[in-house]
Amino acid sequence: MAAIDLIREQIDRCESEGIEILCCPEGILGGLADYAIRPQDIAIDVEAGKLDEVLAPLASDTVTSIVGFTEITPNGRLHNTAAIYHRGGVIGLYRKLYPAIRKSVYEAGDEIPVFEVGALKFGIVICLDSNYLEPARIMAAQGATALFVPTNNGLPAEKADCALCVQARNVDIARAVENTVSVIRADVAGRTESLVSYGSSGIVDPDGMVLASARKLSEDFLVADTETTPREPRRGWNASTNSSVMKEYARLVRDV
């Protein structure tokens, strides 16, 4: 699998530069099932041990990888999933909560976990999930100081637009500032016979400062340090000091 070779190259670079976590794009293994002729052909059965076999070449003593793929469950359901691969084993999975704006072959995930590697506690929100404020806030409330955003904005040429990169960056800044967390987005970039992605990869710090931004339409490699200790108090989390605001917000959420 060519993607595994590419990821291995990036892991080797991470090892040489002292980088501890590598975030890969959404669906980097096999692409997105929504564009596959036979989605089951690119799906990986985690419970049968197939994922461990596929990821074995990525084993590293110092680098943890976040790898996107299509998961198939024993009952045949498909999930858009990211695996955390740490020291030769899968230590966690995140299933995309909002598979698509309109229609998708993927089932929605129903868990909002956080993960720990070394001193870093982090969450994962896949692509469209980042547009919703709730998953990020729930993860931050569980102690996450960073959010990784595997993304795949590869679209048919007539739909591809560089404006999508601007929208993604604005979303990253919003999630970072709202939750006082670092946001690390990893997108695909370039052209294939049928798809185009301008590439929205970037790193934003907890104050909303853009630390790194990828070149458009080309492969890139972004690096930044992230904070591992939650800032207290987190910005804007003390709305309860005004009971009227809290009551109105509770009513709004309840009525949605």
Which functions belong to the PLM regions below?
Residues A2-I11, S130-R137:
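Short, acidic/polar
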Residues A3, A59-S60, A108-G109, D255:
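Eukaryotic scaffold repeat domains enriched in small/polar residues
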Residues V67-F69, N80-I84, P113, S201-I203, ...:
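Short beta-strand scaffold segments in enzyme catalytic cores
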Residues S213-R231:
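A hydrophobic, small-residue-rich beta->alpha segment in the mid-to-C-terminal subdomain
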Residues T73-T151, L155-N170, E227, R234-N242:
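Active-site catalytic loop in hydrolytic enzyme cores
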Residues G236-V256:
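C-terminal/domain-edge helix-coil "capping" segments
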Residues I4-R87, G154-A174, E178-N179:
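Cys-nucleophile CN-hydrolase/nitrilase-fold catalytic domain and related Cys-dependent amidase chemistry
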